[in-house]
């Protein structure tokens, strides 16, 4: 196993364990609440989630076929095993893509976004959940990265920077919601107290929350009005997928440059 693959799987395992802590559970509760407002009225055939941990944050979606891409086979919610920067699906294969903190931990966030764009149909939705660098959580990340422990070893991208990248890829950013105004401390009492203080900020959607959720619609026109049946890319190298096996296959990159 290469060092890069080992680090990806180790980060995945560490984040899965951290999300079982009081602070991690509070984070997931708030993220689920914010996502519910964005996905419960979005319809389609297929939803793909890429997450930093073994969790499913798409339960409120009415889309029938929901599945996860993970870096490891030792998961509960994994349906497709591959690297996030090389999604083994055909172009325009899914109606919605959910990126759950994967950009925070990606070594190549530009390529990851290009892959999400490639597999998403025209008119489909991309939802991005990330840690906000302009928050108390962002400060904690800045001083906690040297310790090398999850979730503080991630590299944070601001919602403004991601919005610029999405525009270059012909996405229309429709909503940005902020949340998690509680202090980043693993104490149930302090979490409850600071959450109460943050209710006004949540109501006003202040851009100082610990997380953000971006909803963006793909604007590019489809090449053909006839939609082909959904399928993964076949290859001699097998991967794990729903139904038929799928595998990691090289994909063509968009030529647009993200800065």
Each predicted region: which residue ranges?
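C-terminal lobe and adjacent flexible extensions of AdoMet/dcAdoMet transferase-like proteins
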Residues: 196-259
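A short acidic, Gly/Pro-enriched loop at the edge of an enzyme's catalytic core
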Residues: 85-97
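A short glycine-rich, Lys/Arg-flanked "PGG" loop and its adjoining helix->strand segment in the class I
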Residues: 110-125
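Class I SAM-dependent methyltransferase SAM/SAH-binding core
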Residues: 33, 37-87
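Class I SAM-dependent methyltransferase Rossmann-like catalytic core
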Residues: 1-40
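Conserved class I S-adenosyl-L-methionine
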Residues: 125-153
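Conserved catalytic loop of SAM-dependent methyltransferase domains
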Residues: 173-199, 207-208
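Short alpha-helix
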Residues: 143, 153-176
């Amino acid at each position: 196993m290469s060092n890069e693959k080992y680090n990806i799987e180790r980060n995945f395992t560490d984040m899965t364990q951290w999300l079982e802590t009081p602070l991690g559970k509070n984070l997931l509760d708030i993220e689920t609440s914010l996502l519910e407002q964005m996905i419960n009225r979005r319809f389609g055939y297929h939803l793909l989630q890429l997450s930093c941990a073994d969790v499913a944050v798409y339960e409120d979606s009415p889309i029938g076929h929901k599945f996860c891409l993970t870096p490891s086979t030792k998961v509960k919610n994994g349906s497709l095993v591959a690297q996030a920067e090389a999604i083994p699906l055909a172009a325009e294969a899914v109606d919605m893509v959910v990126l759950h903190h994967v950009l925070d931990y990606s070594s190549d966030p530009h390529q990851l976004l290009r892959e999400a764009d490639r597999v998403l149909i025209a008119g489909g939705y991309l939802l991005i959940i990330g840690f906000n660098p302009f928050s108390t959580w962002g400060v904690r990340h800045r001083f906690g990265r040297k310790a090398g422990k999850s979730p503080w070893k991630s590299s944070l991208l601001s919602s403004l920077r991601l919005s610029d990248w999405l525009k270059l890829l012909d996405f229309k950013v429709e909503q940005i919601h902020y949340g998690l105004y509680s202090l980043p401390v693993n104490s149930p009492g302090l979490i409850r107290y600071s959450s109460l203080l943050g209710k006004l900020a949540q109501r006003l959607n202040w851009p100082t929350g610990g997380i953000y959720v971006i909803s963006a619609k793909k604007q590019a026109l489809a090449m053909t009005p006839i939609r082909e049946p959904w399928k993964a890319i076949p290859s001699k190298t097998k991967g794990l997928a729903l139904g038929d096996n799928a595998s990691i296959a090289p994909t063509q990159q968009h030529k647009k440059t993200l800065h």
